[in-house]
Every structure is written in structure tokens, then in C-alpha cells.
Amino acid sequence: MDSLNAFTGVVRRCVDDYGMISPGDRIAVGISGGKDSLVLLAALAYLRRYYPAPFELEGITIDTGFPGMDFSGVEKMCEELGVPYTRVPTDIREIVFDARQEENPCSLCSKMRRGALNTTMKEHGCNKLALGHHFDDAVETFMMSLVFEGRLNCFKPVTYMSRADVTQIRPLLYIGEQRSANLAGQLELPVVKSTCPMDRTSKRQEIKDLLTTLSVQYPDVRSKVFGAMQRLPLDGWGPTPHERVKTRERKKEE
């Protein structure tokens, strides 16, 4: 059985490898209500207790307006963790599905949510935004870029958005989706089920299914892809500080 301590240890390694947290940071955690954003919040709140670089946390939910999504459990969790929480009601669902009737609603919805997040976190004095993208998300995004665009591309572990003056960090990149789900269940986190009609019908789901099929014959296919992303090196991905140390040691031995 996993523990929050062990889980947070892996998160810390990712944070350290990519220099995600600096002293005095006020980090907004983007909380969708899904398992990944909640385990990210739990891990960062735990890490905050002993991390050598003092930092503050704040939870922010952009409520897109889909019916039946109750965030009261998330609010209670934040209260118990001593993390300020803000839920921002929006009409994103109405704009995307009713007014615009987008053929690709996920893209516009994502942009609008990110814009609302950036605005809210700046209003609350936050300088960094922690997102719940994990190991599997990174591999899937890379494969989507390859299969659908013919490019080798993925979001970065740390991204500075100059127009918004916001630094995005992704501390869960060393955590697999199943481990995240297991810990969320073990801790009985207040997961809010998405009622979006596009859930599990996207191009991302197609790639997820493809990787699942490949992993039957090649069980470590996701790890191989992730390793390739760090070794290319893909912009912003590698080598990590730990790998630089190992490289220097190998050169000394030679």
C-alpha cells in the first residue's frame, strides 16, 4: 500500500530535478476536482511542512458551469489542510457548447479555463501555477503530437508564460496515473466526477487506448517513451540535474 510520505518523496524528486519551487513562492494549485489535482494538493501540502524552500499554497477551481458538480468536499479538504480555497463560477460551458457550438470544444474550454486561472491567481498574489499533469499525460501528449501533427513536442515540466507573467509547474510528472488513482482512493479524497459530455471521447483517449494496447506486448512502452523525451532532449525536459551528475561520473570513469 502506498503512503502519502512515499508519494510525496517522488513528487519532491521531480520538483528538485526541474527546480520547480523557490523560497517565497506562492503557488496556486489548479483544482478541477479530479483525482490528480487533489493528490497534487495533498502532496504539496505535505511537502510544504518540511521543504527547505518555504512556500505558500492556494487552491483555485474554475467552475465551468456543468451541472451536478459539487465542490463542497474540495472546500472542506482545503480547510483541513490549511490552504485558502477559491471557486470561480463561469459560463464557459454555455459559451463553448451553446453560443459557439465548437466542433473542438476541448481546446476552447482549456484556453478559457487557463485564462481564468491565470487571472485569479494573479489577483491572489500567486506567482506559480501547479497543474496535475502526470507521467501518463506527458507520454500521451508526446504521442498525440507525433501521431496527429508529425512533431516531437510536449508541454514542459516548467513553463514561463510571458504574456500572463505566470510560471506553470507540473510536480506529478514522475507519478503514473494508476498510482495517483490508488492514493486518491486510499486517502478517500473528495473527487468530483466530471459531467462534461466530451469526457473520454477525445483524441487523447484514442492515444490512451493505443498505448494500453501496445503495453500488452511491450509492458514498458510508456517508460521507454518518457525516457526518450528526456534524452532527446525535448525542450525543457532534460537532462535533469540528477542525470547531469551521473553523466559527469561516467565521464570520470572513462
Task: Specify the residue positions occupied by each region the protein language model found.
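Mobile, glycine- and charge-enriched loop segments
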Residues: 83-104, 166, 228, 235-248
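ATP-dependent adenylation/nucleotidyltransferase module used to activate substrates
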Residues: 1-143, 148, 178-186
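Short, basic, helix/turn surface patches
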Residues: 110-122, 158-164, 211, 215-230
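The feature marks non-catalytic terminal segments
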Residues: 189-254
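Conserved active-site and cofactor/substrate-binding residues in soluble primary-metabolism enzymes
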Residues: 6, 112, 175, 202, ...
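Short, solvent-exposed coil/turn elements at secondary-structure transition points
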Residues: 63-65, 91-93, 161, 174, ...
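Catalytic subdomain that performs nucleotidyl-dependent activation
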Residues: 56-57, 136-216
